[in-house]
From Swiss-Prot:
SUPFAM superfamilies: ARM repeat (SSF48371). The keyword ATP-binding does not apply. This is Bilin biosynthesis protein PecE. Belongs to the CpcE/RpcE/PecE family. SMART domains: EZ_HEAT.
């Protein structure tokens, strides 16, 4: 029997319990994309559904369910997400879970995340360090500072982001800005997102001249502007410059 097209929350929720893995994956994406809070329970079930497993050992549906729960930002998902951290077979699933816990921002995630950081097993360190920064877990500084020398430049950037948010010292921002001109396109993209996440106003010009798509520049300049406008002491001159830069980028898109 042909599966019903996913055109509504009801059909998406029903599809999650179906047999077609591709449709189930799309249904999880659809529920997150459209912020369907009614899909919360079905997504929590899908988070532990091991039927869809690829030859390399990963669980695509579980990953997508984790991402969708992060988009819903429902704190009731935190216990399920924490339990999903225990899956050692799929680090990409663990990475998706960590990102969603950071997006929800519930402090119940702090201890499990610290346990992962202190584990002797390899972890998705970039996501883990970024999550601890988002949750403002500054007690992790002794464990995170050594990652400034990690072999992965993206992990180094995550550590620099954490250290800047903690100390506000410009040396850490400079480490991120340096990667805006890196030969690796994905590292340039990661650096732009790091600068947007810390809302560093002095990085605006560096973002504008970086070799990244205008859509990424626009997204992260908007994040910096929003952070600036939420600040009680807005620098109106800098805000005006940001508005102008955003307008110019919109025209170019």
């Amino acid at each position: 029997m042909t599966a019903e097209p996913i055109l509504s929350p009801e059909t998406a929720i029903a599809a999650l319990s179906g047999e077609d893995n591709q449709i189930r994956y799309y249904a999880a994406w659809w529920l997150g994309k459209h912020n369907v809070q009614a899909g919360f329970t079905a997504l929590c079930v899908a988070l532990f559904d091991e039927r869809y497993r690829i030859p390399s050992g990963g669980y695509p549906l579980r990953r997508q369910a984790a991402r969708a729960l992060g988009l819903l930002k429902n704190p009731q998902a935190v216990p399920a997400l924490i339990a999903a951290l225990e899956c050692d077979e799929d680090l990409r699933l663990r990475e998706a879970v960590i990102c969603s816990l950071a997006a929800i921002g519930d402090k119940r995630a702090v201890t499990p995340l610290l346990n992962l950081l202190q584990s002797s097993q390899a972890q998705p360190y970039e996501a883990l360090i970024e999550a601890l920064a988002t949750l403002q877990v500054w007690s992790a500084r002794p464990q995170i500072e050594p990652f400034l020398q990690h072999y992965s430049e993206r992990v180094q950037c995550a550590a620099a982001r954490y250290m800047y948010l903690l100390t506000q010292e410009s040396e850490y921002i400079e480490r991120i800005v340096k990667n805006l001109n890196h030969d690796n396109m994905y590292l340039r993209w990661a650096a732009v997102f790091d600068l947007g996440a810390v809302a560093h106003q002095q990085a605006v010009q560096a973002i504008l001249t970086a070799q990244v798509p205008n859509s990424l520049k626009l997204l992260n300049l908007k994040r910096i502007l929003e952070a600036m406008l939420n600040n009680n002491s807005v620098n109106h001159e800098k805000a005006a410059l940001l508005f102008g830069a955003i307008d110019d980028l919109l025209i170019q898109l």
